[in-house]
């Protein structure tokens, strides 16, 4: 009894399998190929490619799947990306349903030219093509219920408008817009087959400069002047990998900036070495900047990498200007200031010497209503006048104080400016009288050497010694005010500290 029931159940469940096997065998059987041919001919006979399925009825629902093979290139210059994919569309066309053969019919790709297919296009497409090796990569598969599966292998270059303000620390959203070109939502509808699983292969993609962080599937309708159209969007979120730029741009810029600071340790009088180093680093930074601009589009705003390279260029250029300042102070401004200070001190000392000499050798005296200028030496050490001066006192008298009164003074030999009593070129050294008739000169009892040559020489020697001391002091103190070594020492600290602060602010701002 049990065996009979068991055999009965087995016969019921195995019947469809037997029918399918028989049908498959009949289809593959060359003698039954005529049945398949008749079925296809019947489907295509009288088929009007000009009319959509269910014309005049509800809109055709077209489901789409995408299997991404690769993303070949993302170009910042052209603002686009290249995508290779297997693009599949499925819809139901009752005119293509059949029940004679319970199997799917995969037909030659040329049959697609005889069937109605959706007028799908990529809205942001720049250039696309269907692969044709070894034959045109198209597939048509018919199901018994009239479902049509239409597959293509396509490579498309789609526009992707990028915001490069944070380049190369940026994230970009690139989309693929799929839309019907002629049919409105009254005739056709688009949807993603399998919902979130409609797009596959994203996780397997590896890009040299980007990582795919996420992707989204969007279904919407857009309205134009000609009507409302269905649209599907596939949006990729791409994050740029910074490793390449650290090795190719950031690290060379940092090292070149640090290299420019080596000039602070080179002696300030080594002009050739410091100037050559500064100019080399400036030109290298310019080359890096130029190469980077060639790989990016000409956009009106400043990018993150532009800010960094501009900062490095400023530091390199300032290092070169630092030596220009040092060179000017050491070889230009410093000696000029020393020379001016020395001249000013010498003029002040000469003026003071004149005043001291006048006070020492001339004394105004007024006696008996007559004003005299007396030549005297407070030290008491008098010396005879220079031999180059020859006086002839033709008339003289003695006053009660034993001073010689000269009524006539004849100077036989004119005194040169350089042969004056003080050697200062003062014309007053030859004028001994306030009035035209008499001069009080010296006491008669004093010897001829009372004109003080030794005292004058000692006084001049003291002034010269004092001037030398002041000049030596100037020579020591002036470089302290503009010390080139101090500028280099401060630069060794200032430049690295400010550059480190610049890097901290830059990376905190752009990374976060």
UniProtKB/Swiss-Prot annotation:
Q: Which InterPro entries match?
A: GABAA/Glycine_rcpt, GABAAb_rcpt, Neur_chan_lig-bd, Neur_chan_lig-bd_sf, Neur_channel, Neuro-gated_channel_TM_sf, Neuro_actylchol_rec, Neurotrans-gated_channel_TM
Extracellular-side stretches of the chain, per the record, are 26-244
A GO cellular component term found in this entry reads:
GABA-A receptor complex
Please name every pair of cysteines joined by a disulfide bond in this record. 160-174
List positions binding histamine: 121, 180-181, 226
Indicate which residues are glycosylated according to the record.
Answer: 32, 104, 173
Q: What is the protein's given name?
A: Gamma-aminobutyric acid receptor subunit beta-2
Annotated transmembrane regions: 245-266, 270-292, 304-326, 490-511
Q: Does the keyword Transmembrane apply?
A: yes
Domain remarks: The extracellular domain contributes to synaptic contact formation. GABAARs subunits share a common topological structure: a peptide sequence made up of a long extracellular N-terminal, four transmembrane domains, intracellular or cytoplasmic domain located between the third and the fourth transmembrane domains.
Which Pfam family is one of those matched by this entry? Neur_chan_LBD
Record-stated family: Belongs to the ligand-gated ion channel (TC 1.A.9) family. Gamma-aminobutyric acid receptor (TC 1.A.9.5) subfamily. GABRB2 sub-subfamily.
Record GO terms (molecular function): chloride channel activity; GABA-A receptor activity; GABA-gated chloride ion channel activity; transmitter-gated monoatomic ion channel activity involved in regulation of postsynaptic membrane potential
**Which residue stretches are annotated as topological domain Cytoplasmic?**
327-489
Gene3D superfamilies linked:
Neurotransmitter-gated ion-channel ligand-binding domain (2.70.170.10), Neurotransmitter-gated ion-channel transmembrane domain (1.20.58.390)
Membrane topology per the entry is: Multi-pass membrane protein
Q: Which sequence positions carry the modification called Phosphotyrosine?
A: 441
- Localization terms from the record: Postsynaptic cell membrane; Cell membrane; Cytoplasmic vesicle
Tell me what controls its activity: Allosterically activated by benzodiazepines and the anesthetic etomidate. Inhibited by the antagonist bicuculline. Potentiated by histamine.
């Amino acid at each position: 009894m049990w065996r009979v029931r068991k055999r009965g159940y087995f016969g019921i469940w195995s019947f469809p399998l037997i029918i399918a096997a028989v049908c498959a065998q009949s289809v593959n059987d060359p003698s039954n190929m005529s049945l398949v041919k008749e079925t296809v001919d019947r489907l295509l006979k009288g088929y009007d490619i000009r009319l959509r399925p269910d014309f005049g009825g509800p809109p055709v629902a077209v489901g789409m799947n995408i299997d991404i093979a690769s993303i070949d290139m993302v170009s910042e210059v052209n603002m686009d990306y290249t995508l290779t994919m297997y693009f599949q569309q499925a819809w139901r066309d009752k005119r293509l349903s059949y029940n004679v053969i319970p199997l799917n019919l995969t037909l030659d790709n040329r049959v697609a030219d005889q069937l109605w297919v959706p007028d799908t296009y990529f809205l942001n497409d720049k250039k696309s093509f269907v692969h044709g090796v070894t034959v045109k990569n198209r597939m048509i598969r018919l199901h018994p219920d009239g479902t049509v599966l239409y597959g293509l292998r396509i490579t498309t270059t789609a526009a992707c408008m990028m915001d490069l303000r944070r380049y190369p620390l940026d994230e970009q959203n690139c989309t693929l817009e799929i839309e019907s070109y002629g049919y409105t939502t009254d005739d056709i509808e688009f949807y993603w087959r399998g919902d979130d699983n409609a797009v596959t292969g994203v996780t397997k993609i590896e890009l040299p400069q980007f990582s795919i962080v996420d992707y989204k599937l969007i279904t919407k309708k857009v309205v134009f002047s000609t009507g409302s159209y269905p649209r599907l969007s596939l949006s990729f979120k791409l994050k740029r990998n910074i490793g390449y730029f650290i090795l190719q741009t950031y690290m060379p810029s940092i090292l070149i900036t640090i290299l420019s600071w080596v000039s602070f340790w080179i002696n300030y009088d080594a002009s050739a070495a410091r100037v050559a180093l500064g100019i080399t680093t400036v030109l290298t930074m310019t080359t890096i900047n130029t190469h980077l601009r060639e790989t990016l589009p000409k956009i009106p705003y400043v990018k993150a990498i532009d800010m960094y390279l501009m900062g490095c260029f400023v530091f390199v250029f300032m290092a070169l200007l630092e030596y220009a300042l040092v060179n000017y102070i050491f070889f230009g401004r410093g000696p000029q200031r020393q020379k001016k200070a020395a001249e000013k001190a010498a003029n002040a000392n000469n003026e003071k010497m004149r005043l001291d000499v006048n006070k020492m050798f001339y004394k105004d005296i007024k006696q008996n209503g007559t004003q005299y200028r007396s030549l005297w030496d407070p030290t008491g050490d008098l010396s005879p006048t220079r031999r180059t001066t020859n006086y002839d006192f033709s008339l003289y008298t003695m006053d009660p104080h034993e001073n010689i009164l000269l009524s006539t003074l004849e100077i036989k030999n004119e005194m040169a400016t350089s042969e004056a009593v003080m050697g200062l070129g003062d014309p007053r050294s030859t004028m001994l009288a306030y009035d035209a008739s008499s001069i009080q000169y010296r006491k008669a009892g004093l010897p001829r050497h009372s004109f003080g040559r030794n005292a004058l020489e000692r006084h001049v020697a003291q002034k010269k010694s004092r001037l030398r001391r002041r000049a030596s002091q100037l020579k020591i103190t002036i470089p302290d005010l503009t010390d080139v070594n101090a500028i280099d020492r401060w630069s060794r600290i200032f430049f690295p500290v400010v550059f480190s602060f610049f890097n901290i602010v830059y990376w905190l701002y752009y990374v976060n």
